[in-house]
């Protein structure tokens, strides 16, 4: 983000000030709650929003239409559709990232383990790794644990029969999100109960700072981490390990399943510096 902001500042001849979210700042509020509050009060010009927040703010008329920007012309249709609310393109992702498992393949080979495809195979891998002395086989933080739950919950929905009909039923309240989510949370609870994930540590850890993450994983003392892969971190974070690393989707009933995220850049409809913010989005979300 620092590089893209610097590029926009240089190209447009302006200065950008941005606020990052940490648990320390808003211990009683989620990131989405903070974004909703600030956008509804026109506190900022530009926002980085999660998908459900984009839909909420877009439907309330708080976000500007970005369809006229140059960077919007080459969007894939699935991306455009996901960020269109009431006929307006109200957000553009800076990048699309895939969440999954980063695996130290050298450790797996030493333990004679194959990469897991199903939840049952994953549990067996964790059992063996723990027996081999890896106290917490899976590194995690408070942000990304949910992605494993989503993989379990929606693997069938998005890879099964009539996706549109199932989504419509959810939106209409004819089926319950809890029915989809429960198996995922139950599986996560199993991982925590068996000691494969340090939940207490993850609860208070920021990204890459949890037990088993960051330096632990890169040093080869933790076999698996939950993380994301995208253009922005191919050469950072876990991009250059000294061991053979495999990136796989989360094990599910349908095999390895990545979870895609399209966090979007949006501009406040009534932002104080609306025109300048639109130009910034055009730069930071460009193909360059």
Question: Model regions: which residues?
Answer:
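Extracytoplasmic/periplasmic substrate-recognition and gating elements
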Residues: 20, 110-111, 238-288
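A ligand-binding cleft/hinge motif common to bilobed small-molecule-binding domains
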Residues: 52-57, 227-243
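Extracytoplasmic "Venus flytrap"
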Residues: 1-3, 23-24
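Hinge/lid segment of periplasmic solute-binding proteins
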Residues: 49-99, 114, 123, 180, ...
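Extracytoplasmic "Venus flytrap"/periplasmic binding protein-like
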Residues: 10-77, 106-117, 214-218, 223-224
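Glycine-centered hinge/linker elements that transmit conformational signals in sensory
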Residues: 128, 170-205
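A local structural motif
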Residues: 11-25, 43, 112-114, 189-207, ...
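Extracytoplasmic/periplasmic solute-binding protein
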Residues: 90-94, 99, 123-173, 180, ...
């Amino acid at each position: 983000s620092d590089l893209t902001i610097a590029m926009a500042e240089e190209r447009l001849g302006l200065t950008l000030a941005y606020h990052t979210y940490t648990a320390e700042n808003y211990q009683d509020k989620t990131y989405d709650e903070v974004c909703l509050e600030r956008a509804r009060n026109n506190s900022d010009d530009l926002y980085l929003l999660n998908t459900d927040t984009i839909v909420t703010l877009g439907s309330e008329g708080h976000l500007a239409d970005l369809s006229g920007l140059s960077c919007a012309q080459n969007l894939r249709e699935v991306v455009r559709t996901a960020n269109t609310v009431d006929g307006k393109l109200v957000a553009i992702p800076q990048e699309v990232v895939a969440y999954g498992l980063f695996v130290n393949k050298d450790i797996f080979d030493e333990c004679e383990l194959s990469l897991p495809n199903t939840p049952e195979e994953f549990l067996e891998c964790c059992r063996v790794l723990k027996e081999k002395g890896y106290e917490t086989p899976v590194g995690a933080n408070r942000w990304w644990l949910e992605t494993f739950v989503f993989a379990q919950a929606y693997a069938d929905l998005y890879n099964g029969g009539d996706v549109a009909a199932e989504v419509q039923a959810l939106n209409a309240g004819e089926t319950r999100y809890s029915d989809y989510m429960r198996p995922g949370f139950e599986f996560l609870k199993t991982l925590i109960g068996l000691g494969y994930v340090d939940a207490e540590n993850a609860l208070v850890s920021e990204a890459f700072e949890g037990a088993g993450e960051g330096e632990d994983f890169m040093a080869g003392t933790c076999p698996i981490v939950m993380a994301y892969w995208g253009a922005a971190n191919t050469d950072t974070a876990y991009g250059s390990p000294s061991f053979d690393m495999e990136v796989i989707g989360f094990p599910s009933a349908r095999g390895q399943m990545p979870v895609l995220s399209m966090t979007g850049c949006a501009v406040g409809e009534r932002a104080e510096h609306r025109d300048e913010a639109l130009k910034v989005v055009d730069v930071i979300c460009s193909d360059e």
